[in-house]
Amino acid sequence: MEAEQLRIFLAVAEQGSFTAAAKALFVSHSTTSRAVSALENELGTALMLRHHRTVTLTPAGEVLQREARKILDQAEELKQAVQSSVEC
């Protein structure tokens, strides 16, 4: 599980579609699809229900959305703390 996969997953969840997330992140549709599929394979469960042009989160996807947001927020805080210590 990589931070970039989590970032893409969150974008798809927030945008409600792979296409919209890809546009927002300036990546290809296949990049977003592969990232979410890799997470699903690693976790052994579906994270999103894919409809014609939209997606909805499964219960597992809702858990991942909540926890991934925490992880990425903490990673950003860590980065800022380290950068601040170097500037001193």
Model-derived segments and spans:
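Short helix-boundary/capping micro-motifs
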Residues: 11-28
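Helix-turn-helix DNA-binding elements, focusing on the entry/boundary residues of the two helices
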Residues: 17-18, 36, 50
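Short helix-loop hinge/linker segments at domain boundaries
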Residues: 52-55, 62, 73-88
